[in-house]
A protein has these predicted regions:
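A flexible loop/linker signature enriched in serine peptidases of the S9 family
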Residues: 62-75, 91-99, 111-131, 139, ...
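Active-site-proximal cap/loop segments of hydrolase catalytic domains
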Residues: 491-690
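Non-catalytic accessory segments flanking enzyme active sites
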Residues: 50, 163-165, 172, 181-184, ...
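Mature N-terminal segment immediately following signal peptide/propeptide cleavage
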Residues: 28-70, 74, 78
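Residue-level detector of Asp-centered blade-edge/turn motifs that repeat once per structural unit
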Residues: 53-54, 105-106, 157-158, 231-232, ...
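Hydrophobic beta-strand positions that form the internal "hydrophobic ladder"
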Residues: 55-58, 107-110, 159-163, 236-237, ...
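Cap/lid segment of the alpha/beta-hydrolase catalytic domain
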Residues: 243-244, 297-298, 405, 413-536, ...
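Short loop/turn segments that connect beta-strands within beta-propeller blades
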Residues: 81-84, 134-138, 208-212, 258-263, ...
Length: 690
């Protein structure tokens, strides 16, 4: 729910990245065209870069979406880290997805997770297993045969073992025709994309491929995740909330378990004792330190800044040290440098997501990769090589390598599609909110748009989710599509967003729809004042918290000709015990029967009579993040009041719409709704109209 950035320390990085983003659009015959909805299925998503032990190759995933087949599929690819077009080769075959690529320590194998038929008895419904592929050729073979499947894994440093994350299983259910009933005893009993939660937990196992031996090394009524091998292979660090009531707090700590223990983890050693969440452990090369992500003020739940900390791995070695208190920016994915003297991590800062580096002493913070970009992930090689997945407004994520302080492009996955497109121009903006607070955002202008040439364009305020997230310099397909349709698209990072410090983020604590409303409206006013936006042709919308803030907007103003509220909340007390935010609701708003006035005052539903804006409402019927009952309630009220409205519910979809035809349908409905009410052109949906 949160993301990252930092100051422009390495200003020189702006030039090579921007040049790569534009120069990669090598022309084909014919004039460039505008982006369309169908380009969503032509563009591919690159992910999970992993550098080989000899630093010569980078393995990664490429995800494609097939509209006709109604599925997405991820395949493993490999490219020479030195770069060069034509060097990328696929490692896995079409027909089944592969994820979580890892190199075996000797560099011979690329392993991955996949749910494929293995040929074993009872394999009619294959579970996710660890597979291995000899990079020199041949077919992939399964390493594991775990009946319930594997959720995550990591190789031991010597390559002789793997640590697996495996979920418990139920005893056999006696009925073959009726599903097992859910018997709930937990405080937290739902999770989006999972459904009802039971008492089954994830634990760590050590698997030895040579003997097929599988040994459980943790147990108990706790979830154990994020395993990381100590460099000598003797122990494993992991994250787990082992408090008396794990569902009633965020007290995840770092623990260490001996890799060859035979007592199922009864003799664990707790490394951190912070009352808030500690996670993402990473070992120093000498095994003396563990770097991890921590929260200093856990009572602020998701508004608290994620910090980088280190702790001695040996008991009695000293207290944890928080290295980034003065940075005050959310960060993630710490990794030690090969010499152990510094730690690399991702950091959100003012609409960027950079790769940062800080010494183990907490001194000399720098940004090896920074600028008008969004680093989605990165990998370090044993020789210090760094590969990063970088997106820009003109290019979805591709893999780059860091070389002598500059980034060089390694993969060119989407060049053939991008070469024929005319994309929107993107400008970062800064303006004061109503109380004088400085707010930042981005403005997308249609291809060929000239500011100051009358008339200004119809404009759409699109609000990000979270609320603890930020718009960045990443490629944004939705914004590019709307701009191609002739709209100026306004993105604002209002208070509550990450990337601007904890005080900025916590400013909306128990006060949603107030300061953040002022901030997004100030972004609209700024676009109007500077000649981008036509004040008489405005639309608004968003998904998740973007939809929630949209609900506040349309209860407070009639300036917008159209609104789209997706997967939003509206009557907050009705969500208590129904969505998966039990703990967060109580921390921020208190118990609804004890603090009823606040719950009611914040709920946009109680101002529904003020809404006059034509509003399209959307959601998935299996969403346990922000349940569809919310948009159903708002739809019912607007229909009763005689307001122009429609409700679209996507079958079988969670908070994230995944079915390709529904993704297409949603975008087409966006365009049709805005065209009809903002442009007044009578837009229609050509997709799945029922």
């Amino acid at each position: 729910m949160r993301q990252l950035r930092g100051w422009l320390v390495a200003v020189g990085m702006l030039v090579p990245v921007a040049a790569a983003a534009q120069g990669g659009q090598r022309g084909q015959g014919g004039a460039p065209r505008l982006l369309t909805v169908d380009d969503l299925f032509a563009l591919k998503e690159v992910g999970e870069p992993q550098i080989s032990p000899d630093a010569r190759w980078v393995a990664y995933t490429v995800t494609t979406t097939d509209l006709k087949a109604e599925k997405s599929e991820s395949r493993l690819w490999m490219a020479p880290l030195a770069g060069g077009e034509g060097g990328a080769v696929p490692l896995t075959v079409p027909g089944s997805s592969a994820s979580a690529p890892r190199w075996s320590p000797d560099g011979r194998y690329v392993s991955f997770l996949a749910a494929r038929k293995t040929g074993a008895p009872g394999d009619s419904e294959p579970k996710t297993q660890v597979w291995a592929l000899d990079r020199r050729g041949g077919e992939a073979r399964p390493l594991t045969h775990v009946p319930q499947g594997v959720e995550a894994y990591e190789w031991s440093p010597d390559g002789s073992k793997l640590v697996l994350v495996i979920r418990d299983t139920f005893p056999t259910w006696t009925s073959s025709k009726a599903a097992r009933p859910w018997v709930i005893t937990r405080l937290q009993f739902k999770r989006d994309e999972v459904g009802y939660l039971d008492t089954l937990r994830t634990h760590l196992y050590v698997f030895t491929p040579a003997s097929n031996a599988l040994t459980q090394i943790t147990s108990g009524n706790y979830d154990d995740t994020e395993p990381a091998w100590r460099p000598d292979g003797k122990s494993i660090a992991f994250a787990s909330n082992r408090s008396d009531n794990p569902d009633g707090n965020l007290d995840t700590n770092i623990w260490i378990v001996v890799a060859d223990n035979a007592d199922r983890g009864k003799t664990l050693r707790q490394v951190t004792t912070n009352p808030g969440p500690d996670g993402q452990p990473a070992w120093s090369p000498d095994g003396q330190w563990i770097a991890y992500v921590t929260v200093v003020e856990p009572d602020l739940i998701w508004y608290a800044t994620d910090h980088l900390a280190v702790v001695p791995a040996q008991g009695g070695g000293g207290a944890p040290q928080v290295l980034t208190r003065t940075l005050d920016r959310n960060l993630a994915r710490p990794r030690f440098s090969p010499d152990g003297k510094a730690i690399y991590f991702l950091v959100d800062d003012h609409g960027e997501r950079d790769v940062a580096r800080i010494e183990l002493s907490g001194k000399n913070l720098s940004r090896p990769i920074a600028g008008e970009l969004d680093v989605r992930s990165f990998a370090l090689g044993p020789n210090g090589a760094l590969a990063a997945l970088i997106a820009t407004p003109a290019r979805p994520g591709e893999i780059f390598r860091l070389e002598r302080g500059q980034v060089k492009q390694v993969t060119f996955t989407n060049d053939s599609v991008l070469a024929g497109l005319r994309l929107a121009s993107v400008e970062k903006t800064r303006f004061p909110s109503r109380d004088g607070t400085q707010i930042e955002g981005f403005v997308y202008t249609p291809p060929g748009f000239a500011r100051g040439t009358p008339p200004p364009a119809p404009a759409l305020l699109r609000i990000h989710g979270g609320p603890v997230a930020q718009y960045t310099w990443a490629f944004n397909f939705e914004a590019q599509l709307l701009a191609a349709r002739g709209y100026v698209v306004i993105h604002v990072n209002p208070r509550g967003s990450s990337g601007y410090g904890q005080d900025f983020c916590r400013a909306i604590w128990a006060d949603w729809g107030n300061k953040d409303y002022d901030d997004v409206m100030a972004g609209v006013d700024d676009a109007v004042r500077r000649g981008y936006a036509d004040p008489k042709r405005l639309g608004v919308g968003g998904w998740s918290y973007g939809g929630i803030l949209t609900n506040y907007v349309i209860t407070k103003t009639d300036r917008f000709a159209a609104a789209i509220s997706g997967a939003s909340e509206v009557l907050y007390a009705a969500n208590y015990g129904h969505d998966h935010y039990q703990y967060e609701w109580e921390r921020e708003l208190g118990l609804p029967w004890k603090n009823r006035e606040l719950w009611e005052r914040l709920s946009p539903f109680n101002a529904v009579e003020r809404i006059v804006t034509p509003t399209l409402l959307m959601g998935g019927d299996k969403d346990w993040n922000v349940p569809v009952q919310n948009v159903e309630q708002l739809y019912q009220a607007l229909r009763r009041l005689g307001r122009p409205t429609e409700l679209v519910v996507y079958p079988g979809q969670s908070h994230r719409i995944r079915t390709p035809s529904y993704l297409k349908d949603r975008l087409e409905r966006y365009l049709a709704w805005y065209d009809r009410y903002v442009k007044g052109t009578g837009g229609t949906v050509t997709g799945l109209e029922r």
